[in-house]
């Protein structure tokens, strides 16, 4: 249910923002709101609290974000509060960002390596992945020494495993079949 609610609210806001050519600005402002919620868990708990009235929550939101976000985002937050959907704010923001990214053909990806990648190597891998996938890949590097060497790339739900660890496991499996 949470996913359905989040998608509905995100889609409604996206349609409004896209019509007014504000979808990028709204995305930035929603990301800011999400970071505020993540940085201050007590703030999120306050928003979800049934002990605080909707009007009090809207006053709090207004005092914090009035000068930092556009009226569309502020009104959207008011609607979320009026409908009792405060617990879904982070999920709604995540869904909204996915909608904007899909319009831009943008996909987040992770390159996992045993040691940090050089910036130029990361950019070259990003360019190659973008070219082969036809999408605007946004590549981040994560370090995991257990993969020994090579690179493991995760693009959405796809995995490209070019690690030494995987090659050794494959060789071990093939050798065990031969020896049995």
From Swiss-Prot:
InterPro entries xrefs: ATP_synth_OSCP/delta_N_sf, ATPase_OSCP/d_CS, ATPase_OSCP/dsu
| Bilayer disposition of the protein | Peripheral membrane protein
Q: Point out the signal peptide segment.
A: none
- Please name the SUPFAM superfamilies in this protein's record: N-terminal domain of the delta subunit of the F1F0-ATP synthase
Please name the PROSITE patterns in this protein's record: ATPASE_DELTA (PS00389)
Main location, first listed in the record: membrane
Q: Which Pfam families does its entry note?
A: OSCP
Domain of life, source organism: Bacteria
For this UniProt record, the keywords arranged alphabetically read as follows:
ATP synthesis, Cell membrane, CF(1), Hydrogen ion transport, Ion transport, Membrane, Transport
Q: Which GO molecular-function terms appear in the entry? A: proton-transporting ATP synthase activity, rotational mechanism
| NCBIfam families linked to this entry | ATP_synt_delta, PRK05758.2-4
**UniProt record similarity statement:** Belongs to the ATPase delta chain family.
* Function in brief: F(1)F(0) ATP synthase produces ATP from ADP in the presence of a proton or sodium gradient. F-type ATPases consist of two structural domains, F(1) containing the extramembraneous catalytic core and F(0) containing the membrane proton channel, linked together by a central stalk and a peripheral stalk. During catalysis, ATP synthesis in the catalytic domain of F(1) is coupled via a rotary mechanism of the central stalk subunits to proton translocation.
Whom does it interact with, and what assembly results? F-type ATPases have 2 components, F(1) - the catalytic core - and F(0) - the membrane proton channel. F(1) has five subunits: alpha(3), beta(3), gamma(1), delta(1), epsilon(1). F(0) has three main subunits: a(1), b(2) and c(10-14). The alpha and beta chains form an alternating ring which encloses part of the gamma chain. F(1) is attached to F(0) by a central stalk formed by the gamma and epsilon chains, while a peripheral stalk is formed by the delta and b chains.
This chain belongs to the protein called ATP synthase subunit delta
């Amino acid at each position: 249910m949470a996913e359905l609610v989040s998608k509905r609210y995100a889609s409604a806001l996206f349609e409004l923002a896209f019509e007014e050519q504000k979808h990028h600005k709204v995305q930035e402002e929603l990301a800011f709101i999400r970071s505020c919620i993540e940085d201050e868990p007590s703030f999120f708990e306050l928003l979800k609290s049934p002990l605080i009235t909707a009007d009090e929550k809207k006053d709090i939101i207004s005092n914090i974000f009035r000068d930092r976000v556009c009226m569309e985002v502020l009104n959207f937050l008011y609607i979320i509060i009026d409908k009792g959907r405060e617990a879904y704010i982070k999920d709604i923001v995540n869904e909204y960002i996915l909608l904007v990214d899909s319009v831009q053909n943008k996909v987040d990806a992770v390159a996992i390596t045993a040691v940090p990648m050089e910036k130029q190597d990361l950019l070259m891998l990003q360019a190659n992945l973008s070219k082969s996938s036809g999408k605007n890949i946004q590549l981040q590097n994560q370090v995991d020494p257990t993969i020994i060497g090579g690179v493991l790339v995760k693009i959405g739900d796809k995995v490209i495993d070019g690690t030494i660890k995987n090659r050794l496991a494959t060789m071990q499996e093939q050798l065990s079949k031969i020896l049995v």
